[in-house]
């Protein structure tokens, strides 16, 4: 594709809308700024899809990033841009709205990920992750006011190796991985996508001190209606699928009084 314009598809993942979701004004503001920066760098408008995650929830963000990136076949035309910044790296007062730094990686399939390095936002990524030479302060709304030029620059560099990108900083060696037995995502049906490893001796599970017996199966529909089951689900990559806690015909999330990604699932053998 070298020598002609590339059309970029950007998945933009952010924690703006606990109430407003993808309709939050912040998404539109960032989308507009991205379009402006692409034009400034002589590129066509990107196609942008917004995805809202829970406020400050880096587990949910990291899961969404990996699920979309690893399963893509768009290569370097696909950029994942994410912004979930709890600003928990330093609990003292911050100057000039400083927060966690921007980071970048490229997967073997060519998809590039650029976003705030905070908590578990890169916790499912196995490729090398690098700092981006970009300011980490200057605005309360860094995803609109500070980061978009870096995203556009990364796209501009799509035909070249990431190692030659002028904004590439040092490699990050300490990347937190998401713990076992953790809820990673909750879909619209109330199925809980988790990092639980299937084991024959799991007889019940407990979430936030709410306990129910559970069966195991090869799929979420391999039990009668109304039964709670732990089974491989529809999410995952490279042949590895996340186990899901599902209530057939109902909502496991409602049954366990609406846990959130990051909550721990306790496994019981009896």
Regions found by a protein language model. Name each.
Residues 125-203:
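Anionic-ligand-binding alpha/beta catalytic cores of soluble enzymes and soluble regulatory domains
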Residues 69-70, 91-94, 101-104, 182-183, ...:
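A generic local secondary-structure boundary/capping motif
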Residues 3-83, 263-268:
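Alpha/propeptide regions of enzymes that mature by internal proteolysis
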Residues 106-109, 208, 270:
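Short acidic-glycine loop/turn motifs at beta-strand connectors
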């Amino acid at each position: 594709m070298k020598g002609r314009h590339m059309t970029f598809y950007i998945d933009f993942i952010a924690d703006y809308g606990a109430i407003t979701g993808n309709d939050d004004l912040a998404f539109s503001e960032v989308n507009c700024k991205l379009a402006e920066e692409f034009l400034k760098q002589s590129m066509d408008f990107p196609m942008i899809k917004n995805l809202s995650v829970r406020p400050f929830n880096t587990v949910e963000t990291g899961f969404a990033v990996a699920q979309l990136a690893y399963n893509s076949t768009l290569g370097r035309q696909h950029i994942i841009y994410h912004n979930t910044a709890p600003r928990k790296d330093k609990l003292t007062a911050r100057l000039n709205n400083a927060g966690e730094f921007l980071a970048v990686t490229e997967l073997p399939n060519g998809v590039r990920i650029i976003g705030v390095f905070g908590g578990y936002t890169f916790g499912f990524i196995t490729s090398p992750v690098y700092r981006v030479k970009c300011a980490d302060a200057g605005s309360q709304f860094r995803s609109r006011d500070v980061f978009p030029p870096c995203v556009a620059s990364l796209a501009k560099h799509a035909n070249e190796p990431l190692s030659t990108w002028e904004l590439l900083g040092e490699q990050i060696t300490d990347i937190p991985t998401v713990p076992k037995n953790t809820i990673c995502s909750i879909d619209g049906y109330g199925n809980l996508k988790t990092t639980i490893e299937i084991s024959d001796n799991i007889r019940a599970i407990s979430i936030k001190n709410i306990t129910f017996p559970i069966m195991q199966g090869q799929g979420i529909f391999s039990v009668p209606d109304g039964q709670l089951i732990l089974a491989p689900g529809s999410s995952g990559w490279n042949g590895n699928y996340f186990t899901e806690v599902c209530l057939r015909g109902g909502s496991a999330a409602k049954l366990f009084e609406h846990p959130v990604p990051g909550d721990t699932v306790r496994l019981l053998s009896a």
